[in-house]
Amino acid sequence: MTEVRRRGRPGQAEPVAQKGAQALERGIAILQYLEKSGGSSSVSDISLNLDLPLSTTFRLLKVLQAADFVYQDSQLGWWHIGLGVFNVGAAYIHNRDVLSVAGPFMRRLMLLSGETVNVAIRNGNEAVLIGQLECKSMVRMCAPLGSRLPLHASGAGKALLYPLAEEELMSIILQTGLQQFTPTTLVDMPTLLKDLEQARELGYTVDKEEHVVGLNCIASAIYDDVGSVVAAISISGPSSRLTEDRFVSQGELVRDTARDISTALGLKAHL
């Protein structure tokens, strides 16, 4: 195991981390107070109500201002909730919109395929599971909501990759590398790129036990009203049931479901 050496005196790291956590908690408390105060307040009121020193309150507000989470009225000097908070909230609402629209289609897909249905989004260089509808089979393959999946080695991950422009795709792969999870994980660039090209042509991608041994997945990209990929929908099941002879029929079913969701989100033409 590689030893990580830190500069400074022994025992210094923990107090620094504690101070950082305390500053974060106080920053969140300020945002929550502004929200309860109708979106704005004076620095003195914030300081008084949160029992913080005035200098500390002002310093935290300046940090939040640098992140666009708050801004100061130049005339009155009051502090207001900024655009950064709106952007964070908008991302949450957008994801919830995808799920609320996808819900009926997920149920239909689950009933037609007989497999568990998942919805995932891309978060940086990972896919994150945000929605799931378990199948009714006694044997089913499920992962907890919030699970993180490798982009190159999961059905949902590859569905989030194949619509991307080659430059962005290569950038992601170079950053993440091609870690091997199972004997069938695609760990060389030419093979992965060929797999993604085929997925682009078919409108769906297949994960043949590439992330978990015994688990197969079929996934397709979901697009918003401007044609940007916003999520992926997949079915997952044991490889003994979701067998290779079902890949085409189930792949077309997943692809058509993704297209229906994309249309419901406002996409005018199929990509």
From Swiss-Prot:
Stretches assigned to the HTH iclR-type domain: 21-83
Database matches in InterPro entries: GAF-like_dom_sf, HTH_MetabolicPath_Reg, Tscrpt_reg_IclR_C, Tscrpt_reg_IclR_N, WH-like_DNA-bd_sf, WH_DNA-bd_sf
Residues given in the record as glyoxylate binding sites: 154-156, 207, 217, 234-236
Gene3D superfamilies hit by this protein: 3.30.450.40, Winged helix-like DNA-binding domain superfamily/Winged helix DNA-binding domain
Keyword Transcription regulation found: yes
Feature: DNA-binding region: 43-62
Keyword Nucleotide-binding assigned: no
Domain IclR-ED: 98-267
GO biological process, one term: negative regulation of DNA-templated transcription
Annotated GO MF terms: DNA binding; DNA-binding transcription factor activity
Disulfide bonding pattern of the chain: none
Keywords, alphabetical: DNA-binding, Repressor, Transcription, Transcription regulation
Stored PROSITE patterns: HTH_ICLR (PS51077), ICLR_ED (PS51078)
A matching Pfam family: IclR_C
Biological role: Negative regulator of allantoin and glyoxylate utilization operons. Binds to the gcl promoter and to the allS-allA intergenic region.
Name this protein carries in UniProt: HTH-type transcriptional repressor AllR
